[in-house]
């Protein structure tokens, strides 16, 4: 199985491929690693999203850290192999020639792979409702793509959607800037990928928020002749940040356009017209059938193409619940602090952290 950073280092058509592991990963992959007695950690930093804060593995599991970085090779008391990943695996292959794992272990992996296929199929299927889910769009882009094509994303909900629902057809055909979730990388990164890859199409999936952060490289790609296909998924705001707000007990605040617009305003962006003004071939769709047809036209286009579609703001592909991650929630929020200032209870010049800490103690 793979991490987010390692996605497309394996081909998804392998009978024992069980998907990505971790908090944003698939239950199928986590079911495999939870029973492993030996894990080869190849080139991974073993951070919390990958390991579920170290809750995914059996406590007695032995790790072998194969990494060019000594610090990462030694993590979690791994047996460190500080070396090039490819060369190490080639050497291990020679040493293990003729050896094979128990057939029951292979059968377990094959069964988990079938579980992954069933899950992904359930997410990408057309349910006849508009707007579509992210997963349905990912499924149609995947159907359109070939083994030579490249898919890219960065911020918002799309990393999670592609991590689970994208089944890689080619090696090194996937890029997700998830180290910092850098909003706008979807456009600039796709332009760079188009420069670097003379064969195949470059697909980039971007949310409306990231599009607004950085979009001028659409013009740059048209100007330089490096074609890319940009799918703009408009959820009418910053839906993933809003999701994080409310999932920890907070109230939705200033992330969705409907909650942020001033009185009497309807400040919506015409993404199709905006992209067209930068020279791109553009399409706006209102059904999954239209989206599929737009993908065909975008592939045939002689320059950068932008497909604009609405998307559901609250329909995300959940990562495996067995993958644990802790995000703390404030006992007293800054929203309450602001309210207390307005009521004259606190002075706006005071340090809110000190007072919030005092209030938290009072609540306890």
Predicted feature locations:
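Glycine-rich phosphate/diphosphate-binding loops that line cofactor/substrate pockets in enzymes
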Residues: 33-36, 140-147, 194-199, 297-301
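Glycine-rich, acidic loop regions that bind phosphate or pyrophosphate groups
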Residues: 6-108, 299
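Short glycine-rich anion-binding loops that position phosphate/pyrophosphate groups of nucleotides
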Residues: 6-7, 38, 44-47, 69-70, ...
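Active-site diphosphate/adenylate-binding microenvironment
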Residues: 12, 113-188, 193-194
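Thiamine diphosphate
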Residues: 18, 23-24, 57, 73-74, ...
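Structural motif
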Residues: 38, 150, 201-203
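Short internal beta-strands
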Residues: 1-4, 64-67, 230-234
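Generic structural signal for well-ordered, non-membrane alpha-helical segments
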Residues: 22-29, 33, 81-85, 89, ...
